């Protein structure tokens, strides 16, 4: 039996490719080196008069392809990229975040680090990492600093410093959305939408203009210990298609409220304090508090799911 030169060369290539991928090693002119190595092996076999078997040739080709993939950016190891700005660099009091993720979860939260304005982190467990997949761009208009974050494959994490007026607009194709903003009373508006994935928000605000949570295939969960409206008929909308919808909120006085809930196939459970209930069936709920027509600040709250259950707990902030 002849020595399996080609199989040994292919195995060596696989080992090198694996080590490079695991360590994140970047081999500068690896494309040219692969061609040189492959040509040298073929010449050696020709000079030795060795005729490789099909299995040996297959191992060698797989090794070449693996090393080529690693050299062009394919990686099985985790990757993380972070962008940030300090308060000194920013010099704006109102921040508006627009986050779009095709495949990957999005988390939004706050930090007590005194000089941090914002931090955006992209993390990828493994896969194709090509230039332009993750982008962060900014613009300014009317005294508002607008930050647009876009990702194709990565999970996105956004941290914001305290003391800013904030708008959040987040969309994911496949991936959950989590917003943790307890005690962040400067939030102005929130819009979170996931096509496939859950939407979870913990939001406190004393001057809210809109709060919209939507999910096509996934549950929706909203918790708030203080919601105050910044104007009349401020929408608070939770809209799901297939998943359950859960809402537990405490509203500021003396805001007026119109609250409705509905489901096509599921059921509704409710625990309302301080409301006048006009309709309460298995699939529909309607209630009001205060005079919506004359109130300077008021909410229009809607919770609905086409195929899931709806759970509504609502009352008013004590005092």
What is the predicted function of each stretch?
Residues 118-151, 180, 201-319:
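Short, surface-exposed interaction patches in beta-rich subdomains
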Residues 18, 39, 102-104, 154, ...:
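Histidine/glycine-enriched, metal-chelating micro-motifs
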Residues 155-170:
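Extended Gly/Ser/Thr-rich low-complexity repeat segments
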Residues 73-144, 154:
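Membrane-interface segments at or immediately adjacent to transmembrane helices
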Residues 51-78:
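Internal/C-terminal transmembrane anchor helices
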Residues 2-5, 46-57:
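Membrane-helix interface "capping/anchor" motifs
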Residues 6-48:
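Membrane-embedded alpha-helical segments of integral membrane proteins
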Residues 169-206, 212:
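Right-handed parallel beta-helix
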